Structures are given as structure tokens and as C-alpha cells.
A protein has these predicted regions:
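Conserved DEDDh/DEDDy metal-dependent 3′-5′ exonuclease domain
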Residues: 2-5, 22-92
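Short acidic, Gly/Ser-rich segments with clustered Asp/Glu that frequently serve as metal-coordination loops
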Residues: 8-15, 66
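Short, flexible loop/turn motifs enriched in small residues
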Residues: 15-22
Length: 92
């Protein structure tokens, strides 16, 4: 199983957010027993990362990502996330 746990840091709440400082991720592949991690600050690199995760079908995992992180990424990067999501707020 593959999944990607991530978090973002921004300058404000959704309605006033104008800056994405970084996206931090840990990507796990339990079948191959591998872990990758990184901190992305460049908007193009973040867009490419998200497009890759969606294309290969890796679920994004995080806390409150349905109501904050993903909408902020869509707003600031002009992307639409259509991939799988696991929101730990919803399951807590």
C-alpha cells in the first residue's frame, strides 16, 4: 500500500490566505518497504508533486485536509485535487 502524509504552512485562514510557505510530506510504500520525505517551497514543485501523487493513485493523508489544506492548495496553485483523501479529523 502507498500513501502520502502531508501538511502545509500558510500565512492565514482560508478566506484570507495568500501565501503557501511550504508543503512537508512523508510518502510510504509498504509493499516495497520504502519511505520518502521532503519539504517543498516552490509552487511549481508542489503542483508537480500533487499531480504525480494523483496520477499514480496515492492517497493524501492529513489532519483537516478536506476543509483546509486541499482547498488552500487548489486556491493558491490553481489545481483541482481529484485523488483519494484520508482526513484524520474525520476519523478522530
Amino acid at each position: 500500500m502507498r500513501y502520502c502524509v502531508f501538511d502545509i504552512e500558510t500565512n492565514d485562514l482560508y478566506q484570507d490566505v495568500s501565501k503557501l510557505h511550504c508543503l512537508v510530506y512523508y510518502s510510504f510504500d509498504t509493499e516495497n518497504d520504502t519511505v520518502a520525505s521532503g519539504v517543498l517551497v516552490d509552487y511549481d514543485a508542489i503542483k508537480n508533486f500533487l499531480e504525480t501523487q494523483e496520477r499514480i493513485g496515492v492517497p493524501l493523508v492529513g489532519h483537516n485536509i478536506i476543509r483546509y489544506d486541499i482547498p488552500v492548495l487548489e486556491k493558491l496553485l490553481g489545481v483541482k485535487w481529484n485523488g483519494k483523501v484520508v482526513d484524520t479529523l474525520a476519523i478522530s
